[in-house]
């Protein structure tokens, strides 16, 4: 049985709660000693993992809608993407303010050079910023065919973000490997599209170099 528009509306409400409740828990944990011995790292990892969860959920929607024959599920994709961006922004903010400190934000440039995994994280965030800014129907109409080309960069984020996570942890544990494995699986479901995008990009680069 296919989902109705009303059911999708209620699903959106549930997804908004799924985005908000972790934030409420984090606030509670900060104020009631619910974090570990290194609360700054705990906050950074929690916000980063939550952003990754919403990224994976966003990537899951299209194949799920296709294979489950639930076309209206696509309506939840933008919502999940915006929550991914929100949590990624919290992740970046927690690093900038809690790790570096307000008075040391100028060090961010140096950190990006000395810690390459931060560069991957910043690139991912900038892409998510662009996708969030252009996620409205008005921007979709304005950009035309370029809109889809821009939003295909979410696949690059799906590659860079798990690498950023794996690279940032001192000891490799199962958790970042699971996130990376899920990202690979979700990308593999799109291998035909990704191969087509790669071949198109290679052709464009070849044509420019041949001029």
Curated annotation (Swiss-Prot):
Subcellular location(s) per record: Cell inner membrane
Example GO molecular function: electron transfer activity
Membrane topology: Multi-pass membrane protein
GO biological process, one term: protein repair
Chief location: membrane
Protein origin, superkingdom: Bacteria
Keywords: Cell inner membrane, Cell membrane, Electron transport, Flavoprotein, FMN, Heme, Iron, Membrane, Metal-binding, Transmembrane, Transmembrane helix, Transport
Membrane-spanning intervals of the chain: 10-30, 82-102, 116-136, 153-173, 178-198
GO cellular component: plasma membrane
Pfam family name, one: Ferric_reduct
Cofactor note text: Binds 1 FMN per subunit.
Necessary cofactors: FMN; heme b
UniProt cross-references to InterPro entries, sorted A to Z: Fe3_Rdtase_TM_dom, MsrQ-like
NCBIfam families: PRK05419.1-1, PRK05419.1-2, PRK05419.1-4
Job of this protein: Part of the MsrPQ system that repairs oxidized periplasmic proteins containing methionine sulfoxide residues (Met-O), using respiratory chain electrons. Thus protects these proteins from oxidative-stress damage caused by reactive species of oxygen and chlorine generated by the host defense mechanisms. MsrPQ is essential for the maintenance of envelope integrity under bleach stress, rescuing a wide series of structurally unrelated periplasmic proteins from methionine oxidation, including the primary periplasmic chaperone SurA and the lipoprotein Pal.
Subunit structure: Heterodimer of a catalytic subunit (MsrP) and a heme-binding subunit (MsrQ).
Similarity comment: family membership: Belongs to the MsrQ family.
UniProt protein name: Protein-methionine-sulfoxide reductase heme-binding subunit MsrQ
Species, as recorded: Escherichia coli (strain 55989 / EAEC)
């Amino acid at each position: 049985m296919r989902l109705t528009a009303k059911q999708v509306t209620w699903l959106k409400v549930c997804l908004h709660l799924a985005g908000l409740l972790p934030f409420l828990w984090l606030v509670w944990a900060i104020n009631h000693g619910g974090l570990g011995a290194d609360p700054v790292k705990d906050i950074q990892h929690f916000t980063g993992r939550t952003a990754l969860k919403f990224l994976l959920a966003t990537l899951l929607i299209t194949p799920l809608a296709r294979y489950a024959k639930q076309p209206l599920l696509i309506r939840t994709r933008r919502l999940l993407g915006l929550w991914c961006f929100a949590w990624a922004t919290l992740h970046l903010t927690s690093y900038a303010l809690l790790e570096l400190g307000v008075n040391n934000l100028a060090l961010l440039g140096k950190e990006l050079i000395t810690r390459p995994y931060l560069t991957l994280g910043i690139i991912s965030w900038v892409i998510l910023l662009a996708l969030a800014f252009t996620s409205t129907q008005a921007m979709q109409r304005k950009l035309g065919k370029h809109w889809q080309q821009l939003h295909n960069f979410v696949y690059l984020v799906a590659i860079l973000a798990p690498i950023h996570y794996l690279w940032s942890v001192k000891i490799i544990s199962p958790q970042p490997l699971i996130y990376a494995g899920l990202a690979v699986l979700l990308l593999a479901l799109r291998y035909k599209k990704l191969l087509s995008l790669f071949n198109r990009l290679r052709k464009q680069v070849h044509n420019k170099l041949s001029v």
